[in-house]
């Protein structure tokens, strides 16, 4: 069983075999209108009906993309992986994007005050989404709060009749101690995913998520079949490893590079990050390192390849690491400098969009308001 609210390490191969997640192979990638590095590098590794989504798109049929945000903490590079996908589909394929803000889920599952959740959603997430390149024009993107979108609330109440307590309990491991708001959260998520069909008519919705969210997709696909709706497609990306190992997490600051970290803080975190190098310099030179266990190399693959010379440079660094011809300090300096550049640029873009955000969000009737002390 996968717990969407508490996951540390994932056996991707087991999940693929046990739950029927299909690998994204070259045949699927060829359906894209252009190459997408997150797929080519194996970061987005699996799917359900992604090929059907792409075929519908190529046939000129209506499609949309939806992926939500949980406003319970600071936004980090792991979250950026989702935004990069949304930006690709919107900017490169001109597909409309839906961004639900899971404020009700944050309230019930994380004990987050709603007003606090709304502030975090605006200051940490919506602002960074826009700075990372997502166009907030309401014709191209809909941002909304679960607590405000009546279509989602009505649909959730109706869909609840399609599920038994045993189904939900067995899917998520809920117990007699689980509050009913938390237990109802998966049904609200199903309504999030299916409601674009209520608004725009039957069509395939793609949901790009981390693999921990697959229980929601399996449940939603079962409900869609019962409701004679088109089953959502989904893609699954690998989690970024935390700087100290395990999963990168907002609740563990030393594991994450936050998008609002200043450049020097980011460099220091990288310098202290876990690597795949030898125990000593001599051992590393003699036996080489293991880039597959190196957080610093992973940062290059996920976010920095274009900054350091592309895939060819990645292959060169990987080879040199294995042969002991490049040491960890060199990689850390390279990654630290590249990250500093990204964070500086992101801060400038946040400032550029900050003054426009109140007007942009006012065009989304179910979105949170910008705080008065903005």
UniProtKB/Swiss-Prot annotation:
A motif ('KMSKS' region) lies at residues 247-251. It is an enzyme of class 6 (ligase). One of its GO terms (cellular component) is cytoplasm. Disulfide bonds: none annotated. A motif ('HIGH' region) lies at residues 71-79. Keywords: Aminoacyl-tRNA synthetase, ATP-binding, Cytoplasm, Ligase, Nucleotide-binding, Protein biosynthesis. It catalyses: tRNA(Trp) + L-tryptophan + ATP = L-tryptophyl-tRNA(Trp) + AMP + diphosphate + H(+). The keyword Aminoacyl-tRNA synthetase applies. Its EC number is 6.1.1.2. The keyword Cytoplasm applies. InterPro entries: aa-tRNA-synth_Ic, Rossmann-like_a/b/a_fold, Trp-tRNA-ligase, Tryptophan-tRNA-ligase_arc. CDD domains: TrpRS_core (cd00806). GO terms for biological process: tryptophanyl-tRNA aminoacylation. Signal peptide: none annotated. GO terms for molecular function: ATP binding; tryptophan-tRNA ligase activity. Gene3D superfamilies: HUPs, Tyrosyl-Transfer RNA Synthetase. It is found in: Cytoplasm. Belongs to the class-I aminoacyl-tRNA synthetase family. NCBIfam families: PRK12285.1-2 (NF008925), trpS (TIGR00233). This is Tryptophan--tRNA ligase. It comes from Methanopyrus kandleri (strain AV19 / DSM 6324 / JCM 9639 / NBRC 100938).
């Amino acid at each position: 069983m996968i717990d969407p609210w508490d996951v540390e390490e994932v056996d991707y191969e087991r999940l693929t075999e046990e739950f029927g997640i299909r690998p994204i192979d070259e045949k699927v990638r060829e359906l894209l209108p252009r190459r997408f590095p997150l797929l080519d590098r194996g970061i987005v590794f699996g799917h359900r009906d992604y090929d059907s989504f792409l075929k519908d798109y190529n046939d000129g049929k209506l499609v949309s993309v939806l992926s939500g945000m949980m406003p319970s903490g600071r936004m980090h590079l792991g979250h950026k992986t989702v935004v990069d996908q949304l930006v690709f589909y919107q900017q490169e394929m001109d597909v409309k994007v839906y961004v639900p803000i899971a404020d009700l889920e944050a309230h019930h599952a994380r004990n987050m005050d709603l007003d606090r959740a709304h502030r975090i959603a605006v200051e940490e997430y919506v602002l960074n989404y826009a700075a990372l390149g997502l166009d907030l024009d309401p014709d191209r993107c809909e941002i909304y709060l679960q607590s405000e979108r009546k279509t989602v609330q009505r649909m959730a109440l109706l869909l609840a009749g399609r599920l038994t307590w045993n189904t939900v309990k067995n899917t998520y491991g809920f117990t007699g101690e689980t509050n009913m708001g938390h237990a109802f959260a998966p049904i609200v998520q199903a309504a999030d995913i299916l409601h674009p069909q209520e608004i725009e008519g039957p069509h395939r919705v793609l949901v790009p998520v981390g693999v921990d969210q697959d229980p929601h997709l399996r449940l939603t696909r079962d409900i869609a079949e019962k409701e004679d709706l088109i089953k959502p497609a989904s893609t699954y990306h690998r989690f970024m490893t935390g700087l100290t190992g395990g999963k990168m997490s907002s609740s563990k600051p030393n594991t994450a590079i936050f998008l609002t970290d200043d450049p020097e803080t980011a460099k220091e975190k990288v310098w202290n990050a876990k690597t795949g190098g030898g125990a000593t310099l001599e051992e590393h030179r003699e036996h080489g390192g293991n880039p597959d266990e190196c957080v610093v190399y992973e940062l290059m693959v996920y976010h920095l390849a274009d900054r350091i010379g592309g895939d060819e440079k990645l292959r060169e660094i990987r080879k040199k690491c294995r042969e002991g011809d490049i040491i960890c300090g060199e990689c850390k300096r390279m990654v630290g400098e590249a990250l500093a550049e990204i964070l500086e640029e992101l801060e400038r873009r946040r400032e550029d969009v900050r003054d426009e955000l109140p007007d942009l969000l006012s065009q989304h009737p179910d979105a949170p308001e910008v705080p008065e002390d903005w």
